């Protein structure tokens, strides 16, 4: 586990790009040495503590970001890179298999994707990485209680349902009710335009940022 000694500046993008700036890695200290298996055991214990108390744990992803993996084994930030797609698919599969108490994952057609305005390339990428990865991970446990929560962000319901029609688990939607923080406006109007597009077939989570 590393921690940088460098001072953070205010040049970081709100899109989440370039958060692993080189200067941050030039002056680091090791906080703790821990193996990957010890890390996995730690999170299994956390999930067990949550499950014992009736708390369901989900992992949400803002896509796509390859921090820590970019530049290794041919992995890049390019949506068309088959190696990157295979990497995310395999990572999703193994996460599901290694954490049996994980109840689901959430995904976003978000800031790290460079084709927001073209066809359904974002959704196709999400399906080929996370969608196929979920199916792979549930192959040996098809009756497992697991769901995918797809954020209704920079996408459309038709693109989600078309691309994820072969998903082997429950598909829910998620919408940011207030877009910004919950106290920024007393009567958020943003959901009004989304209501007609939401489907009765899919549960929709209204999320609020505090």
Give the label of every model feature segment:
Residues 11-31, 56-93, 109:
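Active-site-adjacent "subsite" loops/lids of carbohydrate-active enzymes
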Residues 1-4, 8-11, 36-40, 52, ...:
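Catalytic-core regions of glycoside hydrolase
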Residues 31-56:
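Acidic/aromatic-lined carbohydrate-recognition and catalytic surfaces
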């Amino acid at each position: 586990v590393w921690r940088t000694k460098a001072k953070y500046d205010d040049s970081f993008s709100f899109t989440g790009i370039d958060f692993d700036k080189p200067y941050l890695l030039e002056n680091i200290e090791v906080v703790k040495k821990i193996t990957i298996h010890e890390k996995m055991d730690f999170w299994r214990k956390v999930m067990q503590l949550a499950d014992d108390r009736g708390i369901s744990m989900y992992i949400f992803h803002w896509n796509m970001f390859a921090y820590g993996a970019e530049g290794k084994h041919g992995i890049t930030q390019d949506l068309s890179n088959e190696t990157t797609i295979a990497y995310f698919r395999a990572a999703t599969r193994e996460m599901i298999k290694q954490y049996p108490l994980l109840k689901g994952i959430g995904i976003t057609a978000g800031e790290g994707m460079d084709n927001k305005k073209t066809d359904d390339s974002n959704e196709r990428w999400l399906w080929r990485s996370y969608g196929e990865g979920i199916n792979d991970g549930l192959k040996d446990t098809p009756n497992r209680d697991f769901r995918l929560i797809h954020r209704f962000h920079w996408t459309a319901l038709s693109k989600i349902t078309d691309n994820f029609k072969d998903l082997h688990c429950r598909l829910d939607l998620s919408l940011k009710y207030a877009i910004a923080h919950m106290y920024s406006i007393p009567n958020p109007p943003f959901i009004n335009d989304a209501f007609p597009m939401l489907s009765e077939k899919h549960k929709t989570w209204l999320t609020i940022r505090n």
